[in-house]
Design a protein with these regions (language model features):
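Extended, non-catalytic subsegments within catalytic or DNA/protein-binding/adaptor domains
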Residues: 1-304
Length: 304
């Protein structure tokens, strides 16, 4: 089938689906399956009664943020099916308000990996088989200095890197905040010695022989490199394994810890929000406020 014919077969639902990041679509799909599996009578379109029953069931064992996300997924499923959404019914809204008051809305955030944490991780990551050492070191440094999301690290390609004397520029072809694929360029400046992102990437490419395609790939127990890219989950697992080797609780960390650590460290260093946003690609300063609060809290001097 040629490209023109293929395009002609796309439906409105296809374009709606394409408007969302791949990871977001996957989460929506999983959430929809949870709803359908909760009761054999559940379907799309759903009734207000079905949503209310499901909401009450979720309230017994899920966090508020998870409940909210699943309701959003159900709302999107109705929109994509061209059906009115029962999620915005006053009865559902009232139930959700009650759940928030009862359970609270405190969010569980991944612990930030600040500079000292990162340097300690690089020491323990430097012990092991050559390929894993090179990949993991580059992954940690680039992920932290570039404040990358785990999904962005997983899909980085060699072709996205521009080598400069002063550092490297990495173009994100697709990301959570750039779903249109217009691209966002991050500049990662040079640093001293083994903590330099440019040198770490050059070393990884030299020992791995990876000069095109996906940059970060799986490595088996024989230190052999795979062809496919790492998954976002694999990025988190690498971070967790290395943080555990430093004696910390891996359950408190995730792939997001690198990004959170860069922003927290930047706030502690007094870097203005607009400059941090040039790295993080946050769309508003409001999103950075939780890191700003952490930074200000940690600046409080001891009175003893």
């Amino acid at each position: 089938m040629n490209e023109q014919a293929s395009s002609a077969t796309l439906t409105e639902a296809d374009y709606v689906a394409a408007s969302k990041a791949q990871s977001t679509r996957k989460e929506y799909g999983k959430d929809l399956h949870y709803f359908l599996d909760a009761d054999s009578s559940n379907c799309i379109p759903a009734s207000v009664d079905q949503i209310a029953t499901y909401l009450a069931k979720m309230a017994g064992h899920l966090a508020v943020k998870t409940i909210e996300r699943r309701l959003i997924s159900l709302h999107v499923a109705h929109l994509e099916a061209g059906e009115p959404s029962p999620v915005h019914h006053q009865r559902i809204k009232a139930m959700l308000r009650g759940i928030r008051r009862t359970k609270g809305i405190a969010t569980k955030q991944a612990t930030a990996i600040v500079k000292d944490d990162l340097l300690e991780m690089l020491v323990v990551a430097g012990k092991g088989k050559p390929m894993q050492v090179a990949r993991n070191s580059a992954l940690l440094i680039v992920g932290w200095v570039g404040a990358f999301r785990r999904s962005e690290l997983a899909t980085l390609r060699c072709e996205d890197i521009a080598w400069l004397d002063s550092g490297i520029e990495i173009t994100l072809r697709h990301s959570k905040v750039d779903q249109s694929g217009a691209g966002f360029v991050k500049f990662l400046p040079n640093a001293h010695g083994s903590r330099c992102p440019r040198l770490a990437l050059q070393h990884w490419q030299t020992v791995s022989g990876i000069t095109e395609g996906y940059l970060f790939r799986p490595i088996n127990r024989h230190d052999q490199i795979g062809e496919q890219p790492l998954t976002p989950h694999a990025v988190s697992q690498i971070v967790k394994r290395i943080i555990e080797l430093t004696g910390r609780d891996p359950a408190k960390y995730s792939g997001h810890s690198l990004r959170a650590g860069f922003v927290t460290e930047g706030v502690l260093a007094g870097i203005p929000s607009y400059q941090l946003m040039q790295v993080t690609a946050h769309r508003s300063e409001q999103t950075l406020q939780k890191y700003v609060r952490i930074g200000k809290r940690r600046r409080i001097p001891s009175l003893l």
